[in-house]
């Protein structure tokens, strides 16, 4: 059976998956949350772009959308205008439909215009990361399957589920 370019023991696949998801969590926490949304941390261009690229591959997240929605959440916290308020919408909806709430608010041009200032607006952001946000996820699937064989599909599925599940506070 084809095992991919990298053949690991079962625990190697587990550790690899945990390492990949850890990079994603770090990218969300350091880059999106601290650096982009709150401007509490300055990053050099190299780690900043690494995180943008990694998030494109592992989540399809558009930086301006994420930062805008998070900033609006803080500006309108626990009001009817909060894009993902558990007080207004209910904890069950926020936990189970958080990604859908994100996608809905990302379609609001007023949110992006008002709260998206200072986010990357270069050629690669406009022409690749934003325009083809789902392409990164497809490339990650191909990479996982080529490197790890059929188990790569499971690794990819865990990567795709990681942020929607863990970003809800679990």
Predicted feature residues:
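Non-catalytic, topology-defining segments of multipass membrane proteins
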Residues: 1-170
């Amino acid at each position: 059976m084809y095992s991919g370019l990298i053949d690991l023991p079962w625990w190697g696949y587990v550790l690899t998956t945990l390492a990949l998801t850890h990079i994603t969590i770090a990218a969300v926490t350091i880059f999106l949350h601290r650096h982009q949304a709150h401007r509490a941390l300055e990053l050099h261009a190299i780690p900043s772009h690494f995180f943008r690229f990694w998030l494109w591959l592992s989540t399809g997240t558009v930086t301006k959308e994420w930062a805008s929605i998070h900033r609006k959440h803080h500006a309108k916290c626990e009001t009817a205008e909060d894009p993902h308020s558990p007080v207004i919408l209910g904890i069950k909806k926020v936990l189970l439909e958080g990604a859908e709430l994100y996608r809905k608010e990302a379609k609001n041009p007023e949110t992006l215009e008002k709260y998206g200032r200072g986010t990357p607006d270069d050629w690669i952001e406009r022409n690749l990361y934003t325009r083809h946000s789902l392409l990164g996820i497809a490339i990650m699937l191909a990479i996982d399957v080529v490197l790890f064989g059929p188990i790569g599909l499971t690794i990819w599925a865990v990567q795709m589920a990681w942020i929607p599940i863990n970003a809800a506070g679990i």
